[in-house]
């Protein structure tokens, strides 16, 4: 049987998957472990967490299949440590509660990026429904195209955050 991940199709997350992805901290753990497996200790250090707190989140991600445990290795002082790597499954999930956790993860990550290294823009639009759908489709196709390209382990890692939403800063238009 072919999984949605194998054919590149998004699917609705189960309740457990949606709960796992509803945490900005868990999304940051997935990002940290996307290209390099990290132990619980390394994850805790990278995020400034207590190792027990990190382990709680790691276990949730392992239980839902978003992280996989690799072969144990010897860490500092010969202790047995388990490295974890992101499975990439979260890309193929659609959740009704994911937007706030995505924003939470983005804000935490962008706060650590020096101002000159940020490339941000905002754009106000007025589009008819058909053009709005065209914009959504073209944005999705572009992002999916870059997602599907082979990852170059030697390339510098970058992050992309895209948000399209109704503009609530505009005053309502008056009727003629």
Question: What kind of region is each of these model predictions?
Answer:
Residues 30, 41:
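Residues within the helices of the helix-turn-helix
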Residues 6-9, 14, 18-21, 64, ...:
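Conserved segment of winged-helix/HTH DNA-binding domains
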Residues 1-6, 90-105, 111-176:
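C-terminal regulatory/oligomerization modules of transcriptional regulators
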Residues 58:
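DNA major-groove recognition helix of helix-turn-helix
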Residues 67-68:
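Short hydrophobic beta-strand motif reused across regulatory alpha/beta modules
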Residues 42-48, 61:
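A short acidic, leucine-rich amphipathic alpha-helix
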Residues 52-53:
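Key DNA-contact positions within bacterial/archaeal DNA-binding proteins
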Residues 24, 35-39:
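Short capping segments at the starts of secondary-structure elements
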């Amino acid at each position: 049987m072919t999984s949605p991940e194998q054919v590149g199709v998004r699917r609705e997350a189960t309740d457990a998957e949606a709960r796992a992805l509803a945490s900005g901290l868990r999304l940051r753990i997935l990002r940290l472990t996307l290209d390099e497996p990290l132990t619980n200790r390394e994850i805790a250090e990278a995020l400034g967490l207590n190792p027990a707190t990190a382990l709680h989140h790691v276990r949730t991600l392992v239980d839902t299949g978003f992280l996989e445990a690799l072969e144990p290795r010897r860490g500092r002082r010969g202790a047995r440590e388990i490295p974890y790597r992101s499975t990439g499954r979260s890309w193929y999930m659609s959740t009704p509660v994911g937007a706030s956790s995505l924003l939470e993860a983005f804000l935490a990550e962008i706060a650590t990026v020096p101002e000159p290294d940020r490339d941000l823009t905002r754009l106000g639009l007025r589009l008819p429904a058909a053009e709005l759908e065209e914009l959504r489709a073209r944005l999705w196709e572009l992002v999916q195209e870059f997602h599907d390209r082979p990852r170059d382990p030697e390339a510098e890692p970058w992050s992309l955050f895209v948000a399209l939403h109704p503009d609530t800063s505009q005053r309502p238009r008056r009727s003629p």
